């Protein structure tokens, strides 16, 4: 393929597309660059898989540490398990790509994005999303694209396309919008309690830039002499499908109109119908075309049954404005909440129920040393002090499966809940704890990620975390049939599975903190998105009202089993003194007091212990070690050793000075041992600190009030 090099500019920032330079054996490849960030994206198509009823698409995004000029740590000195950030980027690529492939496609597809170079300005994720579309077009895979993505930031009152890391950090919005020629297809955002109108305006602003990238891809395809492949679906014998439809349609329609059915009851009734048809087919003669077709395609019954269920559920919503559980389109399911569900050994807990969706969230408070170190990926010397983990055990949907480590879905849902709550967390200075939330999905019938947001808000308040405002969330759905559009509030499982959209919105009563929109159709207009966002606000506020009836403010006290944190600041040149050679000093303080000590490079010292007195003891020791001495200061101390010309006194941890024999008393002392002994407690005053840092002490000229204050201070510090 001929080499092509194209550029497109946004606000003076170029995106460069290089085709034909790298990966010549991949189905399609592109090197997409901005600044010094370069991402190689490939798309490859393999043989069709037999006996499957889904699109076998795999998307992998990987970052090589050489891209940032670094060598991996560990014994092997090579990249290991992918960090969470790369998994989330893989999902970011997958989500807008998947709905643009034909539903009938069964070929193995693999999209791989490798970050080959990365600067400190340009995030590579949106480049990888756009690159996936370009590589797919070049590979001539059937695809309803092109598709492109941009990031939108908000700094002050100005929207910015593809902001730098610094601009994202300084702004109130981090929004990624992906779209096709048919409309917006994906939105992912974190926001600092922004009003709905700002979010809608940002999506519109971003989609205009997406259009430019789509046009650039169309021009690139034409320049390469290619076409955008739109293959017709393979012809399928409808005999078996028609047989199933004739026997199942009436019963399915009746079941879906039984609004009193719970999810398990509805599923069981549908299974009975499906089993009856399967039995009927098995009883046909072996040579019967229906039985032959069913034997040849063992997925046909399930797929046709799903299609019929989907058709009648959607028609019921479009024609009657009623859902399978009898709710109105904008009606939220029954909500209930509990806090303090678990004993206080768990620092905070919240149980959120939305009928058959149930999430138990727990909050654990940790020390600064418990923060997650992100040094293994591209983010140098960064630590996460808020962690949100989401678990989805198989029993939550009544299934049995092996329990494995979290998959991409669990990681993605946890990240969304985390992003939803970050804007309302207290600052490190106000609340120095590391916070870990774990959301356990105990029962699932749709919208467990937003259930996690709600349950986690309850757990945070139960744990005494002074959040700025409580956050609630709701998942919106969509049924689109031609020009007919119905937006559904608080979708349940069947509406998510058979609908056209999953749009999750989280926020406070002030504004939105996070949203995530995924489509199953090629695109959506801004008007429909705007309607969904505003409809979600009403749902969020309704749910928030129920939550506040359970707990309306964070608890004043944290759990008695949570660590007590004390924070002090020392001069950075004193850090070495506190740590000591080989960590000897700090280990000694820890062993003596039982407290845990974390020291940051700026001299911030955080001391933690479940027993607050232990933390105070460690604090006093460190303050004593690092205190600046002044002539005339009075302290209580203890004699540590005696020499012929005087006695040495430890009067602060790590601080020792000498009393000359002439300064022991206001009369002549013949021998030091006649006046003091090792172990004696004495009141001393700093007489002089010489140019070598030696501390000379005296027992003379000390007022009784000074002596009393010194004894009192020493008693407190013990």
Swiss-Prot record:
Which residue numbers delimit the KH domain? 563-622
Q: Which InterPro entries match?
A: ExoRNase_PH_dom1, ExoRNase_PH_dom2, ExoRNase_PH_dom2_sf, KH_dom, KH_dom_type_1, KH_dom_type_1_sf, NA-bd_OB-fold, PNPase
Q: Where in the cell is it found?
A: Cytoplasm
* Residues involved in Mg(2+) binding: 496, 502
Where does the signal peptide begin and end?
Answer: none
Q: Which GO terms describe its biological process?
A: mRNA catabolic process; RNA processing
Report the protein's function.
Involved in mRNA degradation. Catalyzes the phosphorolysis of single-stranded polyribonucleotides processively in the 3'- to 5'-direction.
Name of the featured protein: Polyribonucleotide nucleotidyltransferase
Q: What is the lineage of its organism?
A: Bacteria, Bacillati, Cyanobacteriota, Cyanophyceae, Nostocales
Name the gene that codes for it: pnp
């Amino acid at each position: 393929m001929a080499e092509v090099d194209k550029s497109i500019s946004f606000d003076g920032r170029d995106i460069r597309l290089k085709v034909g330079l790298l990966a010549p054996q991949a189905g399609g490849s592109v090197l997409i660059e901005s600044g010094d960030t370069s991402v190689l994206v490939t798309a490859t198509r393999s043989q069709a898989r037999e006996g499957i009823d889904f699109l076998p698409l795999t998307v992998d995004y990987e970052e090589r540490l050489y891209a940032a000029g670094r060598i991996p740590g560990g014994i092997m000195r090579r990249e290991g398990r992918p960090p969470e950030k790369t998994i989330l980027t893989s999902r970011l690529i997958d989500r807008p790509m998947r709905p643009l492939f034909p539903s009938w496609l069964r070929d193995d597809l693999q999209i791989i994005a490798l970050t080959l170079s990365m600067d400190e300005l340009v995030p590579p994720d949106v480049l990888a999303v756009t690159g996936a579309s370009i590589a797919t077009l070049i590979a001539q895979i059937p695809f309803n694209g092109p598709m492109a993505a941009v990031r939108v930031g908000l700094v002050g009152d100005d929207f910015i396309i593809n902001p730098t890391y610094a601009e994202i950090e300084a702004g109130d919005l981090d929004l990624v919008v992906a779209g096709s020629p048919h409309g917006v297809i994906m939105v992912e955002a974190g926001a600092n309690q922004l009003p709905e109108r700002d979010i809608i305006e940002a999506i519109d602003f971003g989609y205009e830039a997406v259009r430019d990238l789509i046009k650039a891809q169309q021009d690139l395809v034409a320049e390469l002499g290619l076409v955008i492949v739109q293959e017709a679906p393979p012809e399928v014998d409808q005999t078996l499908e028609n047989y199933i439809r004739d026997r199942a349609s009436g019963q399915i329609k009746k079941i879906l109109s039984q609004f009193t059915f719970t999810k398990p009851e509805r599923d069981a009734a549908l299974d009975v119908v499906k089993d009856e048809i399967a039995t009927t087919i098995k009883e046909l003669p072996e040579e019967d075309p229906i039985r032959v077709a069913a034997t040849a395609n063992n997925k046909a019954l399930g797929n046709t049954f799903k299609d019929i269920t989907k058709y009648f559920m959607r028609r019921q919503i479009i024609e009657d404005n009623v859902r399978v559980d009898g709710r109105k389109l904008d009606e939220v399911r029954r909500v209930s909440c509990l806090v303090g569900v678990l004993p206080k050994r768990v620092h905070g807990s919240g149980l959120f129920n939305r009928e058959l969706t149930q999430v138990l969230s727990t909050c654990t408070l940790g020390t600064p040393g418990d923060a997650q170190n992100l040094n293994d990926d591209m983010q140098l010397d960064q630590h996460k002090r808020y962690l949100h983990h989401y678990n989805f055990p198989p029993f939550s949907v009544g299934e049995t499966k092996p329990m494995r480590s979290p998959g991409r879905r669990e990681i993605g849902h946890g990240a969304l809940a985390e992003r939803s709550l970050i804007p309302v967390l207290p600052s490190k200075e106000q609340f120095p704890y590391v916070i870990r939330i774990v959301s356990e999905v105990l029962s699932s019938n749709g919208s467990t990620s937003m259930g996690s947001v709600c349950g986690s808000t309850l757990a945070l308040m139960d744990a005494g975390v002074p959040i700025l405002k409580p956050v609630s969330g709701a998942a919106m759905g969509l049924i689109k049939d031609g020009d007919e559009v119905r937006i559904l509030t608080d979708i349940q499982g069947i509406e998510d599975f058979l609908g056209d959209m999953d749009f999750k919105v989280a926020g406070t009563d002030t504004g939105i903190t996070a949203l995530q929109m995924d489509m199953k159709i090629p695109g959506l207009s801004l008007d429909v998105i705007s309607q969904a966002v505003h409809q979600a606000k009403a749902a969020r506020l309704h749910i928030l009202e129920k939550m506040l009836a359970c707990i309306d403010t964070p608890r004043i006290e944290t759990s008695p089993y949570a660590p007590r944190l004390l924070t002090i600041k020392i001069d950075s040149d004193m850090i070495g003194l506190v740590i000591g050679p080989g960590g000897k000093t700090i280990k000694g303080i820890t062993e003596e007091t039982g407290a845990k000590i974390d020291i940051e490079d700026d001299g911030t010292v955080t001391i933690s212990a479940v027993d607050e007195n232990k933390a105070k003891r460690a604090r006093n020791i460190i303050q004593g070690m690092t205190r600046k001495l002044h002539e005339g200061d009075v302290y209580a101390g203890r004699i540590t050793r005696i020499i012929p010309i005087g006695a040495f006194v430890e009067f602060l941890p790590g601080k020792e000075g000498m009393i000359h024999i002439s300064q022991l008393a206001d009369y002549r002392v013949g021998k030091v041992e006649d006046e003091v002994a090792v172990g004696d407690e004495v009141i001393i005053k700093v007489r002089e600190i010489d140019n070598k840092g030696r501390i000379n002490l005296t027992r003379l000229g000390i007022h009784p009030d000074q002596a009393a204050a010194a004894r009192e201070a020493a008693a407190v510090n013990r």
